[in-house]
Amino acid sequence: MRTSQYLLSTLKETPADAEVISHQLMLRAGMIRKLASGLYTWLPTGVRVLKKVENIVREEMNNAGAIEVSMPVVQPADLWQESGRWEQYGPELLRFVDRGERPFVLGPTHEEVITDLIRNELSSYKQLPLNFYQIQTKFRDEVRPRFGVMRSREFLMKDAYSFHTSQESLQETYDAMYAAYSKIFSRMGLDFRAVQADTGSIGGSASHEFQVLAQSGEDDVVFSDTSDYAANIELAEAIAPKEPRAAATQEMTLVDTPNAKTIAELVEQFNLPIKKTVKTLLVKAVEGSSFPLVALLVRGDHELNEVKAEKLPQVASPLTFATEEEIRAVVKAGPGSLGPVNMPIPVVIDRIVAAMSDFAAGANIDGKHYFGINWDRDVATPEVADIRNVVAGDPSPDGQGTLLIKRGIEVGHIFQLGTKYSEALKASVQGEDGRNQILTMGCYGIGVTRVVAAAIEQNYDERGIVWPDAIAPFQVAILPMNMHKSFRVQELAEKLYSELRAQGIEVLLDDRKERPGVMFADMELIGIPHTIVLGDRNLDNDDIEYKYRRNGEKQLIKTGDIVEYLVKQIKG
């Protein structure tokens, strides 16, 4: 490709509305342009990267035995009504009617469509297992699209769905998809972790996220410093302290705390160690409970894990925090004065709270706290559960090492769905025993456009993008200095361009009438891994300057050796 016949579209300045580095660099490198909120046009450089990602995904899915299909973006509403997700999905599901007033949706995912297809196409267990995938545009009407293509409304996704007659068969395919995803992200040169995850609104029994580690990530990824343990923070277990609870050394005292309505204020005003405080959060109880609310207690420096809390049998789903009005109606005190002593509703405490002694908490009286509280002396030990987020330094749940926490960008997610959708849509086949058998399903997604942004978040410097070789838009840039004035530079540039292309190498020849500084800046901005610079001064010595983008190292290579050298660098 020649720049004179290409839409390079680089920008010198960073657009003001671009928050994260990937969004900034994708705009500056001429990869994308914003059409409307959460909607982007992909320009040639962006498409080249996108296709590289797509091809790796497609190759590994095919290698894993998955079969490619293509399903409509527009889906009839009756399928979503049949599955029960028409009401559940919320405003992210874009709904519309056609000219015949028939309701449809723009597909954010395709569980319903693929299950409908399979219930009409398959009839016997002999046809299974099967795993279908597509790489296709999806639409989710995000309330606040942000971070460029990281959280856009329209995006490209690889979604796959497998069908089975047994849990054992599903587990085999799930393991194969786990391995395929690991190969996909390894081939792309990404630093990632596969982590245990919550199944969320998709449903099902088991789930793993594939997280690219990056400071701009929206998720907290937890992993052991010693073992292979890794989990999303929502699912990471906070194990109980091994040490027994210390004996009481203080009497429980009622203290006036009129200006301490938060843990931070309590700690500051009374010089308390934060690890000797407990905060109390009230949430709505499950429907049909004899109590309207449930009290959840965590240590003052810890955060409630809402996913864990929602799974408590006495807690309503979705988890809903009580309003001040609801709290006062039950406890007769405000949110800043709550605690376990004389709490008139069920109480669940975190494992580490159960191991505390001589701690401070609200007295359930406005402007008052109890100091020196001890379990079983001042208040009976209530139900104990793991309801907090882990923190860095906690022991790993597998007993090996301690936990580290880094930010991550979710680029892939695999689920064991079980029979959630097949039961709702009555997808079944004749089993080996001749009886009708509901199918067991798995689903497996990769955010293809998000992978591009995540790769940039992990691979950039002050000059621009530093692409991993496997997904770079071009492999080699040829920069001929003053080629329009120097015949030998022009002749050599054309010769190398032809020879490299003949070797199957993707080359960008910068044949613009531009200053050298502009040419260098553009090639570094778009992140081409290998650059060769042709100039009269070096050619006097039969040399060509070679530069590797990732480490910035330069070296002189003889003209006759440069093609062989580049082929070796790229193809190994």
Swiss-Prot record:
It comes from the Bacteria. One of its GO terms (molecular function) is proline-tRNA ligase activity. Its main location: cytoplasm. The keyword Protein biosynthesis applies. One of its GO terms (biological process) is prolyl-tRNA aminoacylation. InterPro entries: aa-tRNA-synt_IIb, aa-tRNA-synth_II, aa-tRNA-synth_II/BPL/LPL, Anticodon-bd, Anticodon-bd_dom_sf, Pro-tRNA-ligase_IIa, Pro-tRNA-synth_IIa_bac-type, Pro-tRNA-Synthase_IIa_type1. Keywords: Aminoacyl-tRNA synthetase, ATP-binding, Cytoplasm, Ligase, Nucleotide-binding, Protein biosynthesis. HAMAP family: Pro_tRNA_synth_type1. Consists of three domains: the N-terminal catalytic domain, the editing domain and the C-terminal anticodon-binding domain. Homodimer. Catalyzes the attachment of proline to tRNA(Pro) in a two-step reaction: proline is first activated by ATP to form Pro-AMP and then transferred to the acceptor end of tRNA(Pro). As ProRS can inadvertently accommodate and process non-cognate amino acids such as alanine and cysteine, to avoid such errors it has two additional distinct editing activities against alanine. One activity is designated as 'pretransfer' editing and involves the tRNA(Pro)-independent hydrolysis of activated Ala-AMP. This is Proline--tRNA ligase. The gene is proS.
